[in-house]
């Protein structure tokens, strides 16, 4: 029987951290890691969408993970997303992540070409084989990857004993129940986890059986999601929903900017905590002067919501 307790809770998706010249800021990575640990999160999800993984070289992704682990190892759960758009680089990152001592590796399916289930399974299992002592998380995000996790594909992957969880970012919350049922049938009640992916419906996902969440806005307002999670565990859904509504309004506000959502969030963290995380890497759009109004209002909304907890 596997123990999924280390996956239960709030796990922010870790932001890419850049120096002024556009290179990886190792100091920024370490500072953000320390900041999130101090906020009381369960863990971090490194090298995913929020980490701008598809715009980074594998060597950069290795450097980021090493910097995170230098601060986080033994303190919080670390899940490393290792997928690249070719198997060889993905396998290399998986082996590196295991050497770093992460709790789990994760992967989206290959993007662009719509591959058959058996090819996706081969791709994921190749990564898992390169990290044979590390648990594996399937990342389902069909609206961006272009490929959805089907039940036949999940059943095939559950033949791999290292498959411990699904990070589910599809919009229908019923998918959480489908994946959870399949995982429990294969692993037992406490042997398989499902993470809620869409931040805007965290409470809904938890109500449908998600064990916790991995989200791209958690790092800018972890207090709100930690409190939501506590209230769900206490059975106080009305109070959890009230905070969810506040978080959603903040997300909608941040999305009003010309600059990418991650650029907005990193600027808010700079203003609130002095974290120098840089902007975003092209072709993602950076902030423009006109975004000042959105950034300032989103920061105000976060501070007000946290103060009301």
Walk through the language-model features, giving the residues of each.
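Active-site beta->alpha loop and helix N-cap motifs at the rims of alpha/beta catalytic domains
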Residues: 2-148
